[in-house]
Amino acid sequence: MYSKLIFPLDPNDAVLLEIPVIISQGVSQKYRLALDDLIYVEACQHRLILHTIQGDFTTRCTFTDLTVCLTPSDRFFHGGKGLLINFAHVSLVQVTGEVLLKNGQIIFCSRR
C-alpha cells in the first residue's frame, strides 16, 4: 500500500493524505488525514510515526514515498534523516536546530 494525496473538488476543503495505518500486528487499514492535522513524521525502526492533532499513527509506508507525496506542497520540510515537519505547526526554529512546535513539543532538526 502506498500513500497518496486526495485533492478536493472544492478548493476550500482540506487536502487529504490517504495512508495505510497499522492497527495490529500484520493488520493495517487505509486512513484519511487532513494535511493540516499532520504535525510531523519521523522514521523509527522501519516504520513511520505520524504525529497528528488526533494522536500518533504508525505506518509501514516508506519514508521516500511519503516525502515524494508531501514535499511538493511547500508546507512540509525535510528536516534531516527520517523527519518531515509541517511548517504550519512550527512556532520557532533555533539556530541550534531545535524546533518549537505550537503544541509545546520540541524536536531536533539537523537541516537548517
Residue map of PLM features:
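Conserved binding/recognition cores within well-folded domains
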Residues: 2-102, 106-108
